[in-house]
Design a protein with these regions (language model features):
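Short alpha-helical segments that sit at the start of domains
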Residues: 2-29
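Short helix-to-turn junction characteristic of helix-turn-helix DNA-binding domains
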Residues: 31-35
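Short, cationic-aromatic polyanion-contact patches
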Residues: 16-23, 74-100
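A short, conserved structural fragment
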Residues: 64-76
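Short acidic, hydrophobic short linear motifs in intrinsically disordered regions
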Residues: 36-47
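Short coil turns linking two alpha-helices in DNA-binding domains
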Residues: 51-57
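Short, hydrophobic-biased segments on the C-terminal half of alpha helices
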Residues: 57-64, 79
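Amphipathic alpha-helical dimerization/coiled-coil segments
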Residues: 93-136
Length: 136
């Protein structure tokens, strides 16, 4: 296991248990489902209506702290009013860890399911199509 993942005392088994906690694993799946694998905070909040916004934020932050997820932001000059400017993706180490532990097997299926969601709120579609750091 890469020493940068989790903490120095975290074993791979403990990290698998950590990422497969129901809410955190749903959030990882939301990242994988996103067309650019780079959702804003709003999109996972919308896709998990039974989970409070505060809980989504808390678990995203835990995934960031464990180096599974990385927060990326648009530069000040690239930001647009009314659009998100912070986004979340799997870190390189996080993706590698998930692949090593066979936790990305459904990635393509998740993207296909996401593509079939027909009743996305207007705001979600707007945010989904917002400029991302890789677009600019």
């Amino acid at each position: 296991m890469d020493d940068s993942l989790g903490s120095a005392e975290t074993t791979p088994r403990e990290l698998v248990h950590f990422v497969t906690q129901q809410t955190r694993f749903a959030l990882i799946n939301n990242i994988l489902q996103h067309p650019k694998q780079l959702p804003s905070m709003y999109e996972p909040e919308e896709l998990n209506p039974r989970v409070s916004e505060a809980t989504v934020y808390k678990h995203i932050q835990k995934l960031i702290d464990a180096v599974i997820v990385k927060e990326v932001a648009l530069d000040d000059g690239q930001r647009r009013q009314g659009y998100p400017w912070k986004f979340y993706r799997l870190s390189e180490d996080g993706r590698e860890f998930l692949e090593e532990h066979n936790l990305l097997a459904a990635e393509e299926t998740l993207q296909q399911i996401y593509d079939t969601i027909s009743d996305k709120p207007e705001k979600m579609v707007k945010y989904e199509n917002a400029p991302r750091p890789d677009d600019i």
